[in-house]
Every structure is written in structure tokens, then in C-alpha cells.
Design a protein with these regions (language model features):
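Conserved strand-helix element at the start of the C-terminal RecA-like helicase core
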Residues: 57-65, 112-135
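Phosphate/oxyanion-binding active-site loops and adjacent basic polyanion-contact surfaces
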Residues: 88-100, 129-134
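Residue-level preference for the first positions of well-ordered beta-strands
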Residues: 25, 116-118, 177-178
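Inter-lobe coupling linker of SF2 helicases/translocases
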Residues: 1-89, 101, 105
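SF2 helicase motor core recognition
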Residues: 74, 165, 179-203
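Conserved helicase ATPase core of P-loop NTP-dependent helicases/translocases
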Residues: 148-183
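Conserved helicase motor "Helicase C" RecA-like lobe of SF1/SF2 P-loop NTPases
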Residues: 124-154
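Short glycine-/polar-rich loops that comprise or flank the Walker A/P-loop
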Residues: 21-23, 147-150, 176, 194-199
């Protein structure tokens, strides 16, 4: 019915040049802390005993949302154990470490072309003066891989349209090489893909 009342064309129909997506999935084994937490999370899902997760017992209202709570913990745990609690330490095989190594690999591979990279994560977004996954990966890129700090930026740093435009222009000019952001802030309306070589999705 829709085709009877509309005239539509696909990108292929009108010859729009679009890059071919080359999707790569990385299988990262859990760290020892993650393995232990997964077992606790499974027991919590069965029993509702929140003390297994290092938190207070569930309220009556929370009891009804037990599986939502478990899902939220699972998302945080899979990204970084420090999203669950500050008692956990960094680990060389966590997702932040693997992501930093991967970003550095493409940074060096496309250095002559000033290739740029987007890093998407809706969890652990940038918060000044507070531990977050964005800043942790940036720290690893600078300290472990020697990438200049000024070439790594967060879309959340832009507080107005001019600052946002400056970030986008910096990416297109190759002055900024890595840009972090959430889906809502970096997913649409950001025409910074002129030199883009890789898009990383963490969650």
C-alpha cells in the first residue's frame, strides 16, 4: 500500500556513493573479577539477594524490578568492573585496555592520512573530575600508547554550538584524531566523517 501512494528511491537507485561496512566483532574473555561477579549475578537473579552484589537488600519496589537491576549490573560489568564499584582495580585485559590498544593500532596505521576514529559508549560517559570510561581509555591512549592528549576529545566537552562546531571541524581537518560520545550526542547530525577510518562501539 505504501508504494502505491509514494514515490521513493533507495540510495542504490540514485547512485549515492556509500562506504561498505566491514563489521568486526571482538571476543574479549572475562577478567577474573568479571567471572566471579557473573556467578554472583546469576545467584542474585535466582534468589534476589542483593548483598551478593555488595549492595543493600532490595526494597519491595526493587524486588519487582529484580531482572532489570540484574541487566543493568550486567551491562556495567561487561564494560568495566569499576562501573559496578570503586573497589575494583584496572586490569590489562579489560575492555578499556583492549579498546585503547585497538584505537592505537588504527591511529598508527592511518597516521599519514590523519585518519580519525569515533568511539561510542552510552555508559561511562565523560564527567569532569570523576572516574569514567571515556577518560580511562584516553589515559591509556596517552600513557600506554603515546597519543597526544589534545588529539583525543569528548563530544560532551562542547557546551555550545560553536564549541561543537570546532570539534567537528577539528575531526575533519585531522587535528582531532579520536572523538568519544554517546549515541544521542554523536550519533546523528555530526558531519565529522571526512577522515573517518573506524567506528568503535563499546556497549
Amino acid at each position: 500500500f505504501y508504494s502505491e501512494i509514494t514515490d521513493y528511491r533507495t540510495a542504490k537507485d540514485i547512485g549515492i556513493d556509500r562506504p561498505t561496512k566491514n563489521e568486526i566483532l571482538y571476543n574479549i574473555p572475562p577478567t577474573p573479577d568479571q567471572e566471579a561477579f557473573i556467578q554472583s549475578l546469576m545467584q542474585f537473579a535466582k534468589t534476589g539477594d542483593a548483598t551478593l552484589l555488595g549492595r543493600e537488600p532490595l526494597s519491595q519496589r526493587e524486588e519487582k524490578a529484580k531482572m532489570l537491576i540484574a541487566t543493568d549490573y550486567a551491562r556495567k560489568m561487561s564494560l568495566d568492573m569499576r562501573m559496578v564499584s570503586g573497589i575494583y582495580d584496572d586490569h590489562p585485559d579489560n575492555k578499556a585496555s583492549h579498546c585503547a590498544a585497538n584505537i592505537a593500532k588504527y591511529y598508527n596505521r592511518f597516521n599519514a592520512q590523519k585518519g580519525t576514529q569515533f568511539v561510542f559508549s552510552d555508559l561511562g560517559t565523560y564527567k569532569p573530575n570523576e572516574w569514567n570510561v571515556y577518560s580511562e581509555i584516553k589515559r591509556k591512549l596517552v600513557e600506554d600508547h603515546g597519543i597526544p592528549a589534545h588529539e583525543i576529545r569528548f563530544i560532551q566537552e562542547a557546551k555550545n554550538d560553536k564549541q561543537r562546531k570546532d570539534l567537528i571541524n577539528g575531526m575533519n581537518e585531522g587535528k582531532i584524531r579520536v572523538l568519544f560520545g554517546s549515541t544521542s550526542m554523536l550519533g546523528t547530525g555530526v558531519n565529522a566523517q571526512k577522515r573517518a577510518v573506524v567506528v568503535h562501539h563499546l556497549d
